[in-house]
């Protein structure tokens, strides 16, 4: 079992005092981030990761269902059953607080869907990230009938994924089907044009000036 399983709301409650702040320093970095209403997805999505993300979202809603949260995403997509990612997506749509999503590094496949599922106007990416859309994939073993059942399930998953992407991007399902026949890479600016995100987070003018002053690439 991944050590991520230790980073749930139970760890938060152990250090939390009543309704006001931490009595002691948070027991781990994810708890510290959670105290600031920040959720970080930095691995492929599997059952354990999905369980953690869902628990964090529900916990934050129970804390304050109107106060915004931020989800930072650096993930290639699903490593396991696609139902784990759909469960996270459905939870994001279920909770009532505004959700800002920020891609840093990579948002691929189902992780790109989670990025696009943030609150409109609050879906963002850092400038050097990459976004990839691709079809669900998977292998199947066993009897021919079992392999056929799995193949049909993959087609159903693909159809559902593309329908959800269509909702969040404004693209037609047919267009997304065509675009994802092969790996479909996008820069953050291209992702804005595609409708996956709303803006690219560029360095501030002051920060750019400091970087140029020390000869750093910008």
From Swiss-Prot:
GO terms for biological process: protein quality control for misfolded or incompletely synthesized proteins. InterPro entries: ClpP, ClpP/crotonase-like_dom_sf, ClpP/TepA. It is found in: Cytoplasm. GO terms for cellular component: cytoplasm; endopeptidase Clp complex. Keywords: Cytoplasm, Hydrolase, Protease, Serine protease. PANTHER family: ATP-DEPENDENT CLP PROTEASE PROTEOLYTIC SUBUNIT, ATP-DEPENDENT CLP PROTEASE PROTEOLYTIC SUBUNIT-LIKE-RELATED. Belongs to the peptidase S14 family. This is ATP-dependent Clp protease proteolytic subunit 2.
């Amino acid at each position: 079992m991944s050590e991520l399983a230790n980073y749930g709301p139970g760890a938060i409650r152990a250090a939390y005092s009543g309704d006001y702040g931490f009595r002691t320093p948070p027991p781990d970095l994810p708890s510290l981030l959670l105290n600031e209403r920040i959720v970080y997805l930095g691995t492929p999505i599997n059952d354990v990761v999905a369980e953690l993300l869902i628990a964090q979202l529900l916990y934050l809603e129970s804390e304050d269902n109107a106060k915004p949260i931020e989800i930072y995403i650096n993930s290639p997509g699903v490593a396991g059953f696609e139902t784990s990612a759909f469960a996270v997506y459905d939870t994001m749509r279920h909770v009532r607080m505004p959700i800002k999503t920020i891609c840093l590094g990579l948002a691929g496949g189902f992780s790109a869907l989670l990025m696009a599922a943030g609150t409109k106007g609050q879906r963002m990416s850092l400038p050097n990230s990459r976004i990839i859309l691709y079809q669900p994939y998977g292998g199947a073993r066993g009897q021919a009938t079992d392999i056929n059942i799995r193949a049909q399930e993959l087609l159903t998953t693909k159809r559902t994924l593309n329908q959800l992407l269509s909702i969040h991007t404004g693209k037609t399902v047919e267009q997304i089907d065509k675009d994802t026949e092969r790996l479909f890479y996008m820069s953050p600016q291209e992702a804005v044009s595609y409708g996956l995100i709303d803006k690219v987070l560029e360095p501030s003018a002051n920060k750019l000036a400091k970087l140029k002053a020390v000869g750093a690439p910008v």
